[in-house]
Amino acid sequence: MTEHTYYREPFVRTPEELLDKKLELAQITKDDLIIDLGCGDGYVMIAACQRYGCRAIGYEIDSEIVEMATKAVEESGLSDRIEIRQKDFSEHDFSEGTVYLLYLTRNELNKFSLPLEIHAPKRTRIVTHDFDMPAWEPKETVEFPLMSGDTKFIYLFEK
C-alpha cells in the first residue's frame, strides 16, 4: 500500500458576487469541459453547467466536502454533466479540460503552472482570482469591487 501525502488548502468559497464575472471572463460554451481543482461544495461548477450547458469535473480530497458537493450536484439535476473526483488534484491529467476555474493560493497555482503550460490543449482558458498564475502573462485582469468594500482581482490566462 502506498501512502500519499498532500497539502490541504482551506475550503474557502468563491464569493457569489464574484462568480458571474469569473464565468463571463472564461467565455464558456456548451462544448467546454470545466475543471475545478479543489472544487469545494461544487457550486461554481453547478452555476457554470446551469448557465452554459457545459460539462465539469471537480477534484476534492476531503471526504466530507465531497459528500456535500455530490449531494449538491444530485439536487441540481446535473449528475450527467458534473463529476466529483475524491482525489488529490495534483494527480489531475492536465490534457483534460478546456476551462480551469481556480481559487487556489499562489503556492498551489505555482505547482500547476508548468503542467498546464506543457499539457493543456491550445486555447485553454484559466480564470483565477486573488492570485495570478506564476510565469503566465494574464490576457485580462479585472479589478472587482465587492459590496464589503474590498477589491478582488480576477485573472484570465489563455494558452
Can you say where each PLM-predicted feature lies in the sequence?
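S-adenosyl-L-methionine
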Residues: 1-31, 67-96
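Conserved SAM/SAH-binding beta-strand->alpha-helix loop
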Residues: 62
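Conserved class I S-adenosyl-L-methionine
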Residues: 31-40
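C-terminal substrate-binding/active-site "lid" region of AdoMet-derived donor-dependent transferases
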Residues: 108-159
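A short SAM/SAH-binding and catalytic strip from SAM-dependent methyltransferases
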Residues: 98-111
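Conserved SAM-binding loop of SAM-dependent methyltransferases across substrates and taxa
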Residues: 43-52
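Short beta-strand element of Class I
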Residues: 54-59
